[in-house]
Amino acid sequence: AKGGPEAAINMLNKNLDLSITDYVTVDFNAVVECVDLLGGITLDEVTDEEAVLMQGYMDEINKLTKNNSKYLSGGGTNVTLDGVQACAYARIRYTKGDDYKRAERQRTVLAAMVAKAQKSDLVTINKLIDAVFGDIQTSFSNADLVALAAQVFNYKLGETSGFPFNHGSTTLGSKGSV
């Protein structure tokens, strides 16, 4: 957002009557590194359409992160993704559901990462912390982040949903979706 994370928080708080005080932003490298350090994540389902759409995003992410991740051969159930593939999956926007579905995919990837981290050991958690410190922006101190990471085994993810809860969209000519 123009003005950085602080401006984004101010806008969200003002427009949605929230009281967000802290933030963490991550770049592609952080997602790729975390998923790879966890040994990949497994998703319940990746559709054939999603597998195809991931390819363009994977090309960009491979280039940016200096990786050489391979395309999925197709969709399926219980699909294990590496870091580049998981990041590409989370970026898909142009399917039925548009940006709302993209946000849902992002929540799915994050939940899979947390679940996998909770099954790992403290050595892996420490490697995750070391790997992502250079790839995040946050209002938290390093000590705060270490304390939060140490509690990863106790986290419980509740139900997640997008906003607005009821939504519709349409395409206006070549201008895209609204």
Task: Describe the predicted segments one by one.
Residues 1-2, 11, 16-22, 76, ...:
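Second-shell loop/turn segments in exported
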Residues 2-9, 21-28, 83, 99-107, ...:
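Solvent-exposed, acidic/flexible segments
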Residues 6-14, 21, 29-36, 88, ...:
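Solvent-exposed, polar/charged alpha-helical surfaces in well-ordered, non-transmembrane soluble domains
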Residues 18, 40-41, 158:
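Short, well-ordered coil loops that connect the C-terminus of an alpha-helix to the N-terminus
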Residues 22-25, 88-89, 159-164:
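Structural recognition of the beta-strand scaffold that forms the well-ordered cores
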Residues 30-124:
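Flexible, polar/acidic helix-loop-strand segments at domain edges
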Residues 42, 49-53, 127-131, 146-150, ...:
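Residue-level signal for alpha-helical context at structural boundaries
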Residues 81, 135-178:
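C-terminal solvent-exposed extensions
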